[in-house]
Structures are given as structure tokens and as C-alpha cells.
Design a protein with these regions (language model features):
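Hydrophobic alpha-helical segments of integral membrane proteins
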Residues: 9, 47, 51, 61-77, ...
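An internal, D/E-rich "acidic patch" concept
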Residues: 58-114
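N-terminal signal-anchor/signal peptide hydrophobic helix marking the start
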Residues: 6-17
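Hydrophobic alpha-helical transmembrane segments of membrane transport/permease proteins
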Residues: 15-66, 85, 156-175
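Membrane-embedded alpha-helical segments of multi-pass transporters/permeases
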Residues: 16, 20, 24-29, 145, ...
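Alpha-helical transmembrane segments of integral membrane proteins
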Residues: 2-3, 89-128, 144, 157, ...
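Membrane-water interface segments at the C-terminal ends of transmembrane alpha-helices
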Residues: 23-29, 59, 70, 134-163, ...
Length: 306
């Protein structure tokens, strides 16, 4: 296992370096002067000169990259031009809220999706199976923003059960988490069903039944345990996508997470904030994928020797 971990860590190093290079180039690949793009052409010369010195835009490219790497190495992602605060501080305040939303969406998707998949496999062609199939088609077909608007219209405007937007207690979390997790619920239900059908027809399950074990024990301890191995990968990738791709959900529900922070930075041309956010979110996604690989190897020892 230690060798597998070492290999995965070594593979993550060039990926993180590539992320660092892309994040650095974001500030300079845009057409025109990045300083004028942020503050406009009407700014006074003193402000323009100060910002150019802070961003080192007049230095040679290798020197700028070396300076950028040295700052990132100590956790300095720069300073937001709009909030006039360190970008790392802005991220520290907003990322826990995104993590809360992603965790709630993952919990909801896991419980509902896996449960529907198991019940569908236990009774193929039944009512639950047809319901799960229809839910899967709807969940995969509808875009996130459309699902969010439908949920707001139904539960906030029509029924008035839940608030339409904002950040607060559990009531504010339900609709964003359901919106973010709907696609995963649909996909997990179909994947769990397929994996469970294969497991229930396997030789080890027939052996367990021949020994007189009850169907509940056969399903949960034998079939489900093996069927969840491919599901782990999907859960890990979805969780990484929740953390890094919740921009639409946070915008629709006015959730004060890092996704909304990125939208505000883009709309106001805050290039250092965009650069720092992209670097942070990309690193988070790489780390989550690494943890997913380790969890998959733990669940299926065959992966370690491939």
C-alpha cells in the first residue's frame, strides 16, 4: 500500500505544477494590459504604476513566474483589487461554506442514490425500479440552473416551505444541496443498480445463499459491499466537482461560497482573485482525486498491484 501511495503522490506533483503554470498564465494570456483591464483606462497614473509594480507585469516572464512561485509557496495568493484584502483570507472565509454545501449534497446523493439503486436491483422491473429509471433520466437531462429554479418555484414561491436564497440554518441548505446533488442521485442510482445486479448473480452470493444466510445479510454484507467499489470513484469525483463546480448553484441561491466569489471576481475583472481562486480550486480537485484513488485501492486490493 505504501508503494501505491508513493506512486500516486509522484503522479500528483506534475499535475500540481501544471496547475501552477496555468494559474500564473491566466493573468497574462488575456489580450491587452491586465492592469488596465482591472482598473480601466481612466485611472490615474499613480494607481496604474502602483498596481503594475505589485503584479510585476514589467518584469521578464521567468522572473515573474519565480516571484509567483515564491509567493504561492508561503500561502500568498495575492491581494484582491475589489475587496482590498488578501485573497487567501477571502478563500478561508468562503471555502467552509462551499464545503458545507458540498458535504450536504454528497450525503443526500449517497443516501438517496445508493438506496434507490439497491432497491431497484432487488426488484428489477418493479415500481421502485421504474421510478429510479425515470428519476435518472430527469436528473441527467435537466441542467443545474433549471433544477434550482424549479425547486425555488415549487418549494419557496408556491408552497412557501423553504427560503428561496440566503445563508443560515438547515432550511437554507436544503434547496441548494438538492439542486447540487440531483444529477449525482440519478447517476448513482443507475450505477449502483448495475453493480448490484452483477454482484447478486455472482458465485459468492449464490454460495452465501446456499449456506442459509438471509437475504438481508446477503444483500448488505456480501453483494452491496462488492457493488460499492466502483461507486467510490463516482462519489469522489462528484465531491471534487461539488467543491470546484458549484458556481451556478451558489449564484442561484445567493450562497456565500467560493463559487460566488469567483463569479463576482470575473464580473468585476478582479484578475488576481480569479488567478488565486483557480489555483486553489484546481489544487483541491487534485487532492480529492488522490484521496479517491487511495480509498478505491483500500476497497479493492487488486488496484494496488496493477
Amino acid at each position: 500500500m505504501s508503494g501505491f501511495i508513493a506512486r500516486r503522490l509522484l503522479l500528483a506533483v506534475p499535475t500540481l505544477f501544471g496547475v501552477l503554470v496555468v494559474a500564473f498564465l491566466l493573468l497574462y494570456v488575456a489580450p491587452g494590459d491586465p492592469v488596465e483591464a482591472m482598473i480601466g483606462e481612466r485611472a490615474d497614473s499613480a494607481t496604474i504604476a502602483r498596481l503594475r509594480a505589485e503584479l510585476h507585469v514589467d518584469d521578464p516572464l521567468p522572473q515573474r513566474f519565480a516571484h509567483y512561485v515564491s509567493r504561492v509557496a508561503v500561502g500568498d495568493l495575492g491581494r484582491s483589487y475589489i475587496t482590498d484584502r488578501p485573497i487567501a483570507q477571502d478563500i478561508r472565509e468562503r471555502f467552509p461554506k462551499t464545503l458545507q454545501l458540498a458535504g450536504a449534497a454528497m450525503l443526500l446523493a449517497s443516501c438517496v442514490g445508493i438506496t434507490l439503486g439497491v432497491l431497484s436491483a432487488r426488484h428489477p422491473g418493479g415500481l421502485v425500479d421504474r421510478f429510479a429509471l425515470g428519476l435518472a433520466y430527469l436528473g441527467i437531462s435537466f441542467p443545474v440552473y433549471y433544477v434550482g429554479l424549479l425547486l425555488i418555484l415549487l418549494f419557496a414561491v408556491t408552497l412557501k416551505w423553504l427560503p428561496p436564497s440566503g445563508y443560515g440554518g438547515l432550511r437554507f441548505l436544503v434547496l441548494p444541496a438538492l439542486t447540487l446533488g440531483m444529477r449525482s442521485i440519478a447517476f448513482l442510482a443507475r450505477m449502483t443498480r448495475s453493480a448490484m445486479l452483477d454482484a447478486l448473480n455472482a458465485d459468492f452470493v449464490r454460495t452465501a445463499r446456499a449456506k442459509g444466510l438471509g437475504e438481508w445479510i446477503v444483500t448488505t454484507r456480501h453483494a452491496l459491499r462488492n457493488a460499492l467499489i466502483p461507486v467510490i470513484t463516482v462519489l469522489g469525483l462528484d465531491f471534487g466537482a461539488y467543491l470546484t463546480g458549484s458556481i451556478l448553484t451558489e449564484t442561484i441561491f445567493s450562497w456565500p461560497g467560493i463559487g460566488r466569489y469567483v463569479v463576482n471576481a470575473i464580473s468585476r475583472r478582479d484578475l488576481p482573485a480569479i488567478q488565486g481562486s483557480v489555483l486553489f480550486l484546481s489544487t483541491v480537485f487534485v487532492v480529492v482525486n488522490l484521496i479517491t484513488d487511495l480509498a478505491y485501492a483500500k476497497a479493492d486490493p487488486r488496484v494496488r498491484f496493477q
